[in-house]
Amino acid sequence: MAGAGPRPATLRTAFAIAWPASLAAIITPVLGLIDIAVLGRGADAVALAGASLGGAVISVLYWSFGFLRMSLSGLSAQALGSKDEVQLRAYLLQGLGIGFTVGFVILILASPIIAAGHMLLVETSEASEDAGRAMETYLRVRLLAAPAVIATTAVLGWLTGQGRTGLLMAITTAIAVINACLSVLFVLRMDQGIAGLAAATALAEVAGLALGGLAVLWVTHQRGGIRRHWSLARARMGLGATMSLNRDIFIRTFLIDIVLLSFARLGAGFGDLTVAANHVLLNLILSVTLLLDGPAIAAETFVGQASGARQNKAALFDAAWRETAKIIAAEALFLFLCLAVFSSAVLRVIVGDGPDSSVVIAEAQRFMPWAIFMPLAVAAAYQLDGVFIGATRADKLRDTMAMSALVFGAVAALSMPLIGNHGLWMALLIFMLMRGALLLHAWPVVKAAVLGHSVGMPPSRAAQDLPK
């Protein structure tokens, strides 16, 4: 209902928000494997290579704009906490404006983006020119849906900030299922090859925007009516501060990209076998820790609503912190135990039974202890990312990420000459620990500042940027 304020965070309510978000995080990559299976049965190895290369470009491009989901989540949660329906909808208008603008810029710059992808992934690698042409075909079709993809990201952030992670899961699942069905139709039945695969995904992404629009209509109907509480003037007035928030989250995300790319690049110095082992273990870590996204999103929601609340802020903050920490700690411990017990079996499943699989598995097992402890190392960073996003203090996320990245570089430089690839893994583990430790150190000061300031902005900007 329109006047509803923030819900107190309990273990039950936090889990109710966290589990659909966790499932949404893992549904897309799991069902995305269907695309590879379909193309493997309906096209040749060149098409499969082109789809893999194109998918890598798309992943980096779209993931870089994930800041829009995070910023809209924190901002909408704060507006909900303050019971400001006009501001809540103004943030959606801002997000859609930014999303469509960025999406159309990507569409306009499609040719330079494709050329850059070709240069980085084909010209400097062993990939064939045929695979490069297949990648270009794939990207030209996929990028047509860029405005829909980025705008949908904004819609999903707006919904998650209100705790509507059930809708997040439903939309994400629908996109994946539509994609899988259209892939089977276009590739296996109509024999359209890589262009058909790309078209299936692009159409599914457009359908996702349509479903997101229906979700917005449903939620606004529940919160006072579809036609009420919209204000373009309010959306324009706060746009500068929203852009600053998005900038800081983008920088934070870019720094993570730099660290992960540096990890891959530094590992290449140890030879092909170590590169393969590092690739397997890193992708395993990134996949299993997706489950931690759910509690992090719950933290965004409850901390954001506590930030916007006009009464009992301190109690709401403490409850949000405490209950989401319980869930993320339990999930991290569960993932740690699963990796510790089933690591050998998991490696056999991932690597398969190819001609070099046994040596790759043996090499990966040498460094598996680092991967086993990674869920525990990253848990605090995940939860505190959600806490700081909910408090819309992305400036601290940016600064602590920069310091953590410098620590990663220093540890890698000092340890790799002494202990080789183990030093690289130690640097990554310390990077994850530093993220959490630095955010934990910054939190008391940020909490004290945010409790006394206005909705949705860092305290230094609240008084001048928010509409009165």
How does the language model describe each region?
Residues 255-259, 263, 268-272, 289-296, ...:
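Hydrophobic alpha-helix feature that most strongly marks membrane-spanning transmembrane helices
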Residues 36, 45-48, 85, 165, ...:
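Membrane-helix interface/capping residues of multi-pass secondary transporters
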Residues 19-74, 145-149, 240-305, 331-335, ...:
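Transmembrane helix-bundle signature of multi-pass secondary active exporters and lipid flippases
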Residues 33, 42-45, 79-82, 161-162, ...:
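Helix-loop interface residues and adjacent transmembrane-helix termini in multi-pass membrane transporters
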Residues 66-70, 141-160, 168-176, 197-213, ...:
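Short runs within selected transmembrane alpha-helices of multi-pass transporters and secretion channels
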Residues 33-36, 154-158, 180-185, 213, ...:
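Alpha-helical transmembrane segments of multipass membrane proteins
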Residues 48-108, 152-161, 165-168, 277-341, ...:
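Small-residue-rich hydrophobic transmembrane alpha-helices
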Residues 1-21, 76-147, 178-181, 187-247, ...:
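Short alpha-helical transmembrane segments in multi-pass integral membrane proteins
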